[in-house]
Regions:
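Glycine-rich/acidic phosphate-handling loop/turn and adjacent ATP-lid/helix
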Residues: 72-90
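Short helix-loop "hinge" at the ATP-lid/N-box region of the Bergerat-fold HATPase_c
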Residues: 50-51
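A residue-level detector for a conserved hydrophobic packing site
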Residues: 39-43
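Short beta-strand/loop element within the Bergerat-fold HATPase_c
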Residues: 57-69
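Short conserved segments within the C-terminal catalytic ATPase subdomain
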Residues: 13-23
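Conserved micro-motifs of the catalytic ATP-binding
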Residues: 31-34
Length: 127
């Protein structure tokens, strides 16, 4: 619930900046064991990248999927034409991948045909 609040607050901020956010979600009823400060760092980086690189004329997609053993959060956006020329070291995304990996999860980010996808999978606490 707390993780969802972090994401939704940032999405609200993006909507206030004029972004069209498209959400899709399974019914989420799970618990995660996560360092909330590190998770804030991960999502802070993702939203910073969205604000810098996303095409404001096309929707940003966010989906939440609950599986038997993990929670999957995906962010998708088209890259703005002027953003394609901006330099990036990719260190932020590498740090995100390490943090999520240290939590026992997986992190993917990549671009294909101008569309950028970030996929985070975090293990659930099974009671």
């Amino acid at each position: 619930e707390f993780l969802g609040q972090i994401v939704e607050e940032s999405l609200f901020d993006m909507e206030s900046e004029g972004f069209d956010i498209r959400r899709s979600s399974d019914e989420i009823n799970c618990r995660l064991l996560a360092d909330i400060n590190l998770c804030r760092r991960v999502f802070g980086n993702i939203f910073s990248n969205l604000l810098k690189y996303a095409d404001r004329n096309r929707p940003v997609t966010v989906s939440y999927q609950q599986r038997a053993d993990c929670l999957i959060i995906c962010f998708g956006n088209y890259v703005a034409e002027d953003a394609q020329e901006k330099e990036s070291t990719g260190i932020g995304l590498k740090t995100c991948a390490k943090i999520i990996g240290d939590h026992g999860g997986s992190f993917y980010s990549g671009r294909e045909a101008g569309f950028f996808l970030t996929k985070i999978s975090l293990p659930l606490i099974v009671s």
